[in-house]
Curated annotation (Swiss-Prot):
Optimum temperature is 70 degrees Celsius. This is DNA primase DnaG. Mg(2+) 1 binds at E175, D220. GO terms for cellular component: cytoplasm; DNA-directed RNA polymerase complex; exosome (RNase complex); primosome complex. Changing D222A: Decreases binding affinity to DNA and primase activity. It is an enzyme of class 2 (transferase). The lineage of its organism: Archaea, Thermoproteota, Thermoprotei, Sulfolobales, Sulfolobaceae. Its cofactor is Mg(2+).
Length: 406
Protein backbone atom coordinates (compact mmCIF):
# COMPACT_ATOMS: atom_id res chain seq x y z
CA UNK A 1 0.00 0.00 0.00
CA UNK A 2 1.43 3.40 -0.91
CA UNK A 3 0.80 6.58 1.04
CA UNK A 4 1.31 10.23 0.15
CA UNK A 5 3.85 11.64 2.59
CA UNK A 6 2.83 14.49 4.90
CA UNK A 7 6.13 15.69 6.32
CA UNK A 8 9.87 15.79 5.61
CA UNK A 9 12.05 15.39 8.73
CA UNK A 10 15.32 17.24 8.02
CA UNK A 11 18.33 16.73 10.29
CA UNK A 12 22.01 17.59 10.19
CA UNK A 13 24.75 15.39 11.66
CA UNK A 14 28.44 15.45 12.53
CA UNK A 15 30.64 12.38 13.01
CA UNK A 16 34.13 12.34 14.56
CA UNK A 17 35.48 10.15 11.77
CA UNK A 18 35.07 9.22 8.10
CA UNK A 19 31.88 7.23 7.43
CA UNK A 20 29.67 6.29 4.47
CA UNK A 21 25.92 6.54 3.87
CA UNK A 22 25.40 2.91 4.84
CA UNK A 23 27.09 3.53 8.19
CA UNK A 24 24.77 6.45 8.95
CA UNK A 25 21.63 4.54 7.94
CA UNK A 26 22.75 1.49 9.91
CA UNK A 27 23.33 3.62 13.00
CA UNK A 28 19.86 5.15 12.72
CA UNK A 29 18.14 1.76 12.40
CA UNK A 30 20.31 0.08 15.03
CA UNK A 31 20.14 2.71 17.78
CA UNK A 32 16.42 3.42 17.44
CA UNK A 33 15.35 -0.23 17.36
CA UNK A 34 13.00 -1.22 20.20
CA UNK A 35 13.15 2.22 21.85
CA UNK A 36 9.35 2.41 21.77
CA UNK A 37 8.41 -1.12 20.73
CA UNK A 38 7.50 -2.56 17.33
CA UNK A 39 4.96 0.20 16.67
CA UNK A 40 7.82 2.68 16.18
CA UNK A 41 10.34 0.32 14.54
CA UNK A 42 11.66 2.28 11.54
CA UNK A 43 11.89 -0.81 9.32
CA UNK A 44 8.30 -1.80 10.10
CA UNK A 45 7.11 1.75 9.40
CA UNK A 46 8.94 1.72 6.04
CA UNK A 47 7.46 -1.68 5.15
CA UNK A 48 3.97 -0.32 5.85
CA UNK A 49 4.58 2.85 3.82
CA UNK A 50 4.36 5.11 6.87
CA UNK A 51 7.98 6.28 6.44
CA UNK A 52 9.77 6.81 3.13
CA UNK A 53 13.33 5.94 2.12
CA UNK A 54 15.94 7.67 4.27
CA UNK A 55 17.99 10.07 2.12
CA UNK A 56 21.54 10.74 3.36
CA UNK A 57 24.11 13.22 2.01
CA UNK A 58 27.64 12.90 3.47
CA UNK A 59 30.68 15.17 3.11
CA UNK A 60 34.11 14.51 4.61
CA UNK A 61 36.47 17.23 5.75
CA UNK A 62 39.53 17.12 7.98
CA UNK A 63 39.00 13.51 9.00
CA UNK A 64 35.39 14.14 9.99
CA UNK A 65 32.04 13.59 8.30
CA UNK A 66 29.00 15.82 8.20
CA UNK A 67 25.81 15.98 6.21
CA UNK A 68 22.05 16.08 6.16
CA UNK A 69 19.26 13.51 6.36
CA UNK A 70 15.71 13.62 5.01
CA UNK A 71 13.10 11.17 6.33
CA UNK A 72 9.66 11.41 4.60
CA UNK A 73 6.82 10.70 7.05
CA UNK A 74 3.16 9.79 6.67
CA UNK A 75 2.63 9.63 10.44
CA UNK A 76 0.70 12.25 12.39
CA UNK A 77 2.38 15.31 13.94
CA UNK A 78 3.02 13.74 17.34
CA UNK A 79 4.41 10.51 15.90
CA UNK A 80 6.56 12.41 13.38
CA UNK A 81 8.01 14.55 16.19
CA UNK A 82 8.78 11.35 18.13
CA UNK A 83 10.64 9.87 15.13
CA UNK A 84 12.69 13.09 14.84
CA UNK A 85 13.60 12.92 18.54
CA UNK A 86 14.53 9.23 18.22
CA UNK A 87 16.97 9.99 15.39
CA UNK A 88 18.42 12.92 17.36
CA UNK A 89 19.31 10.42 20.11
CA UNK A 90 21.82 8.60 17.84
CA UNK A 91 25.25 9.29 19.37
CA UNK A 92 27.48 6.78 17.56
CA UNK A 93 28.12 6.01 13.90
CA UNK A 94 30.37 2.99 13.73
CA UNK A 95 33.13 3.54 16.34
CA UNK A 96 32.87 7.32 16.17
CA UNK A 97 30.98 9.77 18.36
CA UNK A 98 28.27 11.66 16.51
CA UNK A 99 25.69 14.39 16.95
CA UNK A 100 22.32 14.53 15.18
CA UNK A 101 20.28 17.74 15.28
CA UNK A 102 16.84 18.55 13.85
CA UNK A 103 16.79 21.34 11.26
CA UNK A 104 13.04 21.41 10.65
CA UNK A 105 9.93 19.33 10.05
CA UNK A 106 8.51 20.56 6.76
CA UNK A 107 4.77 20.17 6.10
CA UNK A 108 4.86 19.20 2.42
CA UNK A 109 1.08 19.38 2.24
CA UNK A 110 0.87 22.99 3.44
CA UNK A 111 0.29 24.62 0.05
CA UNK A 112 -2.20 21.96 -0.95
CA UNK A 113 -4.06 22.42 2.33
CA UNK A 114 -4.27 26.19 1.80
CA UNK A 115 -5.87 25.68 -1.61
CA UNK A 116 -8.31 23.13 -0.20
CA UNK A 117 -9.32 25.50 2.61
CA UNK A 118 -9.91 28.39 0.21
CA UNK A 119 -11.92 26.15 -2.09
CA UNK A 120 -13.98 24.84 0.87
CA UNK A 121 -14.75 28.43 1.87
CA UNK A 122 -16.01 29.14 -1.64
CA UNK A 123 -18.15 26.00 -1.72
CA UNK A 124 -19.63 26.73 1.70
CA UNK A 125 -20.36 30.33 0.75
CA UNK A 126 -22.24 29.40 -2.43
CA UNK A 127 -24.01 26.53 -0.66
CA UNK A 128 -25.18 28.84 2.13
CA UNK A 129 -26.78 31.16 -0.40
CA UNK A 130 -28.87 28.31 -1.83
CA UNK A 131 -29.95 26.61 1.39
CA UNK A 132 -29.81 27.24 5.10
CA UNK A 133 -27.14 24.93 6.53
CA UNK A 134 -26.91 23.41 9.99
CA UNK A 135 -23.18 22.68 10.02
CA UNK A 136 -23.33 20.71 13.30
CA UNK A 137 -25.88 18.35 11.78
CA UNK A 138 -23.65 17.76 8.75
CA UNK A 139 -20.61 17.07 10.93
CA UNK A 140 -22.58 14.61 13.07
CA UNK A 141 -23.77 12.72 9.98
CA UNK A 142 -20.26 12.48 8.57
CA UNK A 143 -18.86 11.38 11.94
CA UNK A 144 -21.48 8.62 12.26
CA UNK A 145 -20.72 7.33 8.76
CA UNK A 146 -16.97 7.20 9.43
CA UNK A 147 -17.36 5.35 12.73
CA UNK A 148 -19.10 2.44 10.98
CA UNK A 149 -15.87 1.50 9.25
CA UNK A 150 -13.47 2.39 12.05
CA UNK A 151 -10.93 -0.18 13.15
CA UNK A 152 -11.42 -1.56 16.67
CA UNK A 153 -9.28 -3.44 19.19
CA UNK A 154 -10.39 -6.92 20.24
CA UNK A 155 -9.59 -8.88 23.37
CA UNK A 156 -6.92 -8.29 26.04
CA UNK A 157 -4.23 -8.49 23.34
CA UNK A 158 -5.95 -5.53 21.60
CA UNK A 159 -5.93 -7.23 18.21
CA UNK A 160 -6.82 -4.96 15.25
CA UNK A 161 -10.31 -5.92 14.08
CA UNK A 162 -13.44 -4.82 12.26
CA UNK A 163 -16.62 -3.88 14.16
CA UNK A 164 -18.47 -7.13 13.29
CA UNK A 165 -16.02 -9.77 14.55
CA UNK A 166 -18.33 -10.68 17.45
CA UNK A 167 -21.73 -10.73 15.76
CA UNK A 168 -20.88 -12.11 12.30
CA UNK A 169 -20.99 -15.95 12.13
CA UNK A 170 -18.03 -15.90 9.73
CA UNK A 171 -14.49 -14.66 10.40
CA UNK A 172 -11.61 -13.54 8.17
CA UNK A 173 -8.13 -13.79 9.71
CA UNK A 174 -5.36 -11.60 8.25
CA UNK A 175 -1.79 -10.87 9.28
CA UNK A 176 -1.59 -7.21 10.30
CA UNK A 177 -3.35 -3.96 11.08
CA UNK A 178 -2.83 -2.60 7.54
CA UNK A 179 -4.64 -5.66 6.13
CA UNK A 180 -7.63 -5.00 8.42
CA UNK A 181 -7.77 -1.35 7.34
CA UNK A 182 -7.72 -2.31 3.66
CA UNK A 183 -10.54 -4.85 4.03
CA UNK A 184 -12.61 -2.34 6.03
CA UNK A 185 -12.19 0.12 3.17
CA UNK A 186 -14.04 -2.33 0.91
CA UNK A 187 -16.77 -3.27 3.38
CA UNK A 188 -15.37 -6.43 5.03
CA UNK A 189 -16.10 -5.84 8.74
CA UNK A 190 -15.70 -9.39 10.11
CA UNK A 191 -11.89 -9.31 9.95
CA UNK A 192 -9.23 -9.67 12.65
CA UNK A 193 -5.40 -9.64 12.56
CA UNK A 194 -2.86 -11.85 14.28
CA UNK A 195 -0.47 -8.83 14.21
CA UNK A 196 2.34 -10.72 12.45
CA UNK A 197 2.66 -13.44 15.09
CA UNK A 198 5.19 -16.10 14.08
CA UNK A 199 5.77 -17.82 17.43
CA UNK A 200 2.66 -17.22 19.55
CA UNK A 201 -0.89 -16.93 18.27
CA UNK A 202 -3.07 -14.85 20.66
CA UNK A 203 -5.35 -16.96 22.86
CA UNK A 204 -8.23 -14.60 22.06
CA UNK A 205 -8.01 -15.52 18.37
CA UNK A 206 -7.87 -19.25 19.10
CA UNK A 207 -11.05 -19.07 21.20
CA UNK A 208 -12.84 -16.73 18.78
CA UNK A 209 -12.21 -19.04 15.82
CA UNK A 210 -13.88 -21.97 17.60
CA UNK A 211 -17.07 -19.93 18.05
CA UNK A 212 -17.46 -19.18 14.34
CA UNK A 213 -19.34 -21.11 11.66
CA UNK A 214 -16.74 -20.42 8.98
CA UNK A 215 -13.16 -19.14 9.38
CA UNK A 216 -11.08 -17.95 6.42
CA UNK A 217 -7.32 -17.38 6.60
CA UNK A 218 -6.61 -14.59 4.07
CA UNK A 219 -2.83 -14.24 3.80
CA UNK A 220 -0.10 -12.55 1.76
CA UNK A 221 1.18 -14.28 -1.37
CA UNK A 222 4.71 -14.73 -0.06
CA UNK A 223 6.71 -16.96 2.27
CA UNK A 224 5.57 -14.90 5.25
CA UNK A 225 1.99 -15.93 4.50
CA UNK A 226 3.08 -19.59 4.50
CA UNK A 227 4.63 -19.17 7.96
CA UNK A 228 1.54 -17.45 9.41
CA UNK A 229 -0.71 -20.29 8.20
CA UNK A 230 1.66 -22.85 9.70
CA UNK A 231 1.53 -21.08 13.08
CA UNK A 232 -2.26 -20.77 12.98
CA UNK A 233 -2.61 -24.50 12.43
CA UNK A 234 0.05 -25.49 14.98
CA UNK A 235 -1.79 -23.42 17.61
CA UNK A 236 -5.13 -25.15 16.90
CA UNK A 237 -6.84 -22.15 15.36
CA UNK A 238 -9.95 -23.33 13.52
CA UNK A 239 -9.41 -22.75 9.77
CA UNK A 240 -12.03 -23.83 7.22
CA UNK A 241 -10.77 -22.08 4.08
CA UNK A 242 -7.51 -20.53 2.86
CA UNK A 243 -7.37 -17.51 0.55
CA UNK A 244 -4.10 -16.02 -0.70
CA UNK A 245 -3.12 -12.74 -2.30
CA UNK A 246 -1.49 -13.11 -5.74
CA UNK A 247 2.13 -14.31 -5.64
CA UNK A 248 4.43 -11.55 -4.43
CA UNK A 249 1.52 -9.32 -3.35
CA UNK A 250 0.28 -8.33 0.11
CA UNK A 251 -3.34 -8.20 1.30
CA UNK A 252 -2.90 -4.58 2.39
CA UNK A 253 -2.17 -3.42 -1.18
CA UNK A 254 -5.01 -5.24 -2.99
CA UNK A 255 -7.87 -3.40 -4.67
CA UNK A 256 -11.51 -4.21 -3.97
CA UNK A 257 -11.74 -6.36 -7.11
CA UNK A 258 -8.54 -8.23 -6.23
CA UNK A 259 -9.82 -8.93 -2.70
CA UNK A 260 -13.13 -10.25 -4.05
CA UNK A 261 -11.31 -12.48 -6.56
CA UNK A 262 -8.94 -13.89 -3.93
CA UNK A 263 -11.82 -14.72 -1.59
CA UNK A 264 -13.87 -16.28 -4.38
CA UNK A 265 -10.87 -18.53 -5.18
CA UNK A 266 -10.41 -19.68 -1.57
CA UNK A 267 -9.90 -23.41 -1.06
CA UNK A 268 -11.03 -25.75 1.72
CA UNK A 269 -8.15 -26.27 4.16
CA UNK A 270 -7.69 -29.98 3.41
CA UNK A 271 -7.61 -29.35 -0.33
CA UNK A 272 -5.16 -26.47 0.09
CA UNK A 273 -2.79 -28.50 2.28
CA UNK A 274 -2.89 -31.40 -0.19
CA UNK A 275 -1.96 -29.04 -3.01
CA UNK A 276 0.97 -27.64 -0.99
CA UNK A 277 2.15 -31.13 -0.04
CA UNK A 278 2.13 -32.29 -3.66
CA UNK A 279 4.19 -29.27 -4.67
CA UNK A 280 6.72 -29.91 -1.88
CA UNK A 281 7.03 -33.59 -2.81
CA UNK A 282 7.70 -32.69 -6.44
CA UNK A 283 10.53 -30.41 -5.34
CA UNK A 284 11.93 -32.90 -2.79
CA UNK A 285 12.46 -35.56 -5.50
CA UNK A 286 15.05 -33.33 -7.14
CA UNK A 287 17.04 -32.06 -4.14
CA UNK A 288 20.52 -32.77 -5.57
CA UNK A 289 23.14 -30.05 -5.82
CA UNK A 290 26.40 -31.10 -7.51
CA UNK A 291 29.64 -29.21 -6.90
CA UNK A 292 30.40 -26.58 -9.55
CA UNK A 293 27.41 -27.76 -11.61
CA UNK A 294 26.46 -25.36 -14.44
CA UNK A 295 22.99 -23.87 -13.97
CA UNK A 296 21.04 -22.62 -16.97
CA UNK A 297 19.08 -19.38 -16.77
CA UNK A 298 16.78 -19.15 -19.77
CA UNK A 299 15.45 -15.95 -21.26
CA UNK A 300 13.49 -15.49 -24.44
CA UNK A 301 16.68 -14.47 -26.25
CA UNK A 302 19.53 -16.57 -24.87
CA UNK A 303 20.64 -19.35 -22.50
CA UNK A 304 23.27 -18.27 -19.97
CA UNK A 305 25.62 -20.87 -18.45
CA UNK A 306 26.23 -20.12 -14.76
CA UNK A 307 28.60 -21.96 -12.43
CA UNK A 308 27.96 -21.73 -8.70
CA UNK A 309 30.67 -22.51 -6.13
CA UNK A 310 29.96 -25.42 -3.78
CA UNK A 311 29.75 -23.18 -0.70
CA UNK A 312 27.05 -21.12 -2.42
CA UNK A 313 25.05 -24.26 -3.20
CA UNK A 314 25.28 -25.22 0.48
CA UNK A 315 24.13 -21.73 1.50
CA UNK A 316 21.09 -21.99 -0.79
CA UNK A 317 20.02 -25.24 0.89
CA UNK A 318 20.10 -23.52 4.32
CA UNK A 319 18.01 -20.47 3.37
CA UNK A 320 14.43 -21.79 2.86
CA UNK A 321 12.27 -20.87 5.85
CA UNK A 322 14.71 -18.30 7.31
CA UNK A 323 13.42 -15.10 5.61
CA UNK A 324 17.08 -14.11 5.25
CA UNK A 325 19.30 -13.07 2.36
CA UNK A 326 23.02 -12.94 1.55
CA UNK A 327 24.85 -10.29 -0.49
CA UNK A 328 28.07 -11.16 -2.35
CA UNK A 329 30.67 -9.21 -4.31
CA UNK A 330 31.96 -9.99 -7.81
CA UNK A 331 34.16 -12.85 -6.51
CA UNK A 332 31.41 -14.44 -4.38
CA UNK A 333 32.95 -13.00 -1.22
CA UNK A 334 30.40 -12.38 1.54
CA UNK A 335 29.41 -8.72 1.97
CA UNK A 336 26.54 -8.99 4.41
CA UNK A 337 23.72 -11.21 5.68
CA UNK A 338 20.40 -9.36 5.96
CA UNK A 339 16.71 -9.87 6.68
CA UNK A 340 14.63 -10.14 3.48
CA UNK A 341 12.69 -6.98 4.38
CA UNK A 342 15.99 -5.01 4.55
CA UNK A 343 17.37 -6.00 1.12
CA UNK A 344 15.95 -3.05 -0.86
CA UNK A 345 17.01 -0.31 1.62
CA UNK A 346 20.47 -1.91 1.90
CA UNK A 347 20.89 -1.96 -1.89
CA UNK A 348 19.68 1.64 -2.15
CA UNK A 349 22.39 2.69 0.30
CA UNK A 350 25.24 0.77 -1.41
CA UNK A 351 27.24 2.30 -4.26
CA UNK A 352 26.81 0.91 -7.79
CA UNK A 353 28.85 -2.27 -8.53
CA UNK A 354 29.33 -2.98 -4.79
CA UNK A 355 26.97 -6.00 -4.79
CA UNK A 356 27.18 -8.55 -7.62
CA UNK A 357 25.04 -11.47 -6.39
CA UNK A 358 21.98 -11.78 -4.13
CA UNK A 359 20.57 -15.02 -2.67
CA UNK A 360 17.48 -14.68 -0.48
CA UNK A 361 14.46 -16.52 0.92
CA UNK A 362 11.86 -14.26 -0.67
CA UNK A 363 9.99 -13.29 -3.82
CA UNK A 364 11.84 -11.66 -6.73
CA UNK A 365 9.72 -8.60 -7.55
CA UNK A 366 9.77 -6.02 -10.33
CA UNK A 367 10.92 -3.37 -7.86
CA UNK A 368 13.91 -5.48 -6.77
CA UNK A 369 14.83 -6.27 -10.38
CA UNK A 370 14.73 -2.62 -11.41
CA UNK A 371 16.95 -1.63 -8.49
CA UNK A 372 19.35 -4.52 -9.20
CA UNK A 373 19.67 -3.40 -12.83
CA UNK A 374 20.41 0.14 -11.67
CA UNK A 375 23.08 -1.11 -9.23
CA UNK A 376 24.69 -3.41 -11.88
CA UNK A 377 23.93 -6.60 -9.94
CA UNK A 378 24.65 -9.70 -12.02
CA UNK A 379 22.35 -12.33 -10.53
CA UNK A 380 19.47 -12.79 -8.08
CA UNK A 381 18.47 -16.21 -6.72
CA UNK A 382 15.21 -16.24 -4.74
CA UNK A 383 12.54 -18.58 -3.39
CA UNK A 384 10.02 -17.56 -6.06
CA UNK A 385 9.51 -15.11 -8.91
CA UNK A 386 6.62 -12.64 -8.55
CA UNK A 387 4.72 -10.71 -11.19
CA UNK A 388 7.51 -9.55 -13.51
CA UNK A 389 6.50 -7.34 -16.43
CA UNK A 390 9.98 -6.52 -17.71
CA UNK A 391 13.21 -8.46 -17.22
CA UNK A 392 16.38 -6.33 -17.34
CA UNK A 393 18.96 -7.63 -19.82
CA UNK A 394 21.84 -7.25 -17.35
CA UNK A 395 20.38 -9.28 -14.43
CA UNK A 396 20.05 -13.09 -14.38
CA UNK A 397 17.30 -14.48 -12.13
CA UNK A 398 16.91 -18.01 -10.77
CA UNK A 399 14.82 -19.73 -8.10
CA UNK A 400 15.88 -22.28 -5.49
CA UNK A 401 13.97 -24.87 -7.53
CA UNK A 402 16.10 -24.05 -10.59
CA UNK A 403 19.21 -24.80 -8.55
CA UNK A 404 18.22 -27.94 -6.68
CA UNK A 405 16.45 -29.59 -9.63
CA UNK A 406 19.37 -29.17 -12.04
Amino acid sequence: MSFQMKYDIRLRFEVEGIVEKTDVIGAIFGQTENLFGDEFDLRELQDKGRLGRIIVEVKTKGGKSEGEIIIPSNLDRIETALIAAMVESVDKVGPYNSKFELIEIEDIRAEKLKKIIERAKGILSSWSKEKSLDIKEVINEISSAVKVGEITEYGPERLPAGPDVDKDPNLIIVEGRADVINLLRYGYKNVIAVEGATSRIPETLINLSKMKKTVIAFLDGDHGGDLILKELLSNNVKIDFVARAPIGREVEELTGKEIAKALSNMMPLTQYLKKVQEAEQAIAKNVIAKEEKPIQSETTQQVVQITLPQNILEEIKKLPGTLEGVLYDNNWNLIEKVQVRDIIPKLEAYEDNKVAYIIFDGVITQRLLDLASQKNIKMIIGARIGGINKRPQNVDILTFTDIISS
